[in-house]
UniProtKB/Swiss-Prot annotation:
Record-given protein name: Atypical kinase COQ8B, mitochondrial
Name of the top EC class for this enzyme: transferase
Span of the annotated motif KxGQ motif: 156-159
Assigned GO CC terms: cytosol; mitochondrial membrane; mitochondrion; plasma membrane
GO molecular function: ATP binding; protein kinase activity
Organism: Mus musculus (Mouse)
Subcellular locations according to the entry: Mitochondrion membrane; Cytoplasm, Cytosol; Cell membrane
Keyword Disulfide bond: no
Disulfide-bond pairs as recorded: none
Keyword set, alphabetical order: ATP-binding, Cell membrane, Cytoplasm, Kinase, Membrane, Mitochondrion, Nucleotide-binding, Transferase, Transmembrane, Transmembrane helix
Amino acid sequence: MWLELGAMLRRTCGPLGRAVRLPCGGALGPRPHWWGPCRSCLAQSVHQDQPGRGLSEDDIRRAREARLRKAPRPQLSDRSRERKVPASRISRLASFGGLAVGLGLGALAEVTKKSLPGGSLQHEGVSGLGSSPFLSEANAERIVQTLCTVRGAALKIGQMLSIQDNSFISPQLQRIFERVRQSADFMPRWQMMRVLEEELGKDWQDKVASLEEVPFAAASIGQVHQGLLKDGTEVAVKIQYPGVAQSIQSDVENLLALLKMSVGLPEGLFAEQSLQTLQQELAWECDYRREAACAQTFRKLLADDPFFRVPAVVQELCTTRVLGMELAGGIPLDQCQGLSQDIRNQICFQLLRLCLRELFEFRFMQTDPNWANFLYDASSHQVTLLDFGASRAFGTEFTDHYIEVVKAAADGDRDRVLQKSQDLKFLTGFETKAFSDAHVEAVMILGEPFAASGPYDFGAGETARRIQGLIPVLLRHRLRPPPEETYALHRKLAGAFLACARLHAHIACRDLFQDTYHRYWASRQTLPLPAAS
């Protein structure tokens, strides 16, 4: 868990889209063809040519032109291309089998080449993986092509590995997964049409005035298309790749077995419990009805919030594998670096305020730290929140103890950090002193913003490097897995801290947390829990 947290603070948090507009982070697409009036036989099926029955062709054209004037047109990555998604488990297994054979042959060819006169072994990388014959350029391309073809859980893991630090993964392997993170292919029109018909019915065109044929975003689970409802509402329609929901467990097992065998992933990177948690989270993300319900929950929770807004769900375009939402504008957080210091400070303060509200007030958090899920609109000075597939609840038995761990760190009380970590079941109490000291130090480092009496300079700290130095001890000497809630929670908190660091925020966090702390226990109508004896 600390490995993931430290690495998150060193890298970007998932695929960063350019003006992404729907809960589906990823690369963005080429200029699309519209399914609309008089454009094709499909377009004609949604054309409303009778008075009062919908938008005319001119209406749609004017709406589209108005939209283009508001914001730059998103585009898919140059590496993205149309490619069929293997939908059956057999076809997906065949893809992994082909990759295994290809990696083996590629490694053999690499060894042979280096064994010839004039050949030499590579020595790059600090993790001991740099000299692996499996990490040739040809094999790198095989891995990228396979993951971008199968997509789903396998691509999701590849994107997760892209944010790991090269203290644990060789620079070559890191570059491979960085290419995976930036390159997501989209399914062909016929396959997308099949999903739409299976989910919305053969008459699905009657629900929209137009829908773009090529997506503006493509990621690990699905792709996103821009559309227009008959009342003129612009929408973004997320369509899930076929077969990904049914292949989560097999994809995870096949990919990790292959990578451990060929390139030697670090021991402890994906422990058994973290794998189970990952599979559960992926299953949640594949259930678009659940995501729609979570989005509606957040829309209600934040209805009166002056800074954050949540787009409305389009119920008639919502099924298990299709999700329609109101189209939102704005720029991802990473593109806010050019704004004034004051605006950046306000954005980051509000982001931390949201994290604390989610965990300690709502006890319900959207845990995906992808910056493209937070779109800042300068005209309204608001942030639109997107992608609620990874939302989850937290019980009071967890938050009661977790808030005390943070409070102890904010107060600089190392002994209480250790004790409350045991109460939280983060520790057993029988760990080595080296492990206990490393754990407490990591918590104290993360608590520094809440301990500072004045504005904390997120851009000047070395939080990531300091935590990264503790991770080897934390991996080697852990006696029990951390609470399962912390995997997703710490990814989200790390993403928030990283955003503050990237935007060089200077904000006073101590009063923000202290106010949250007192409000929390007031709402619980009880006193803070004493440390267990």
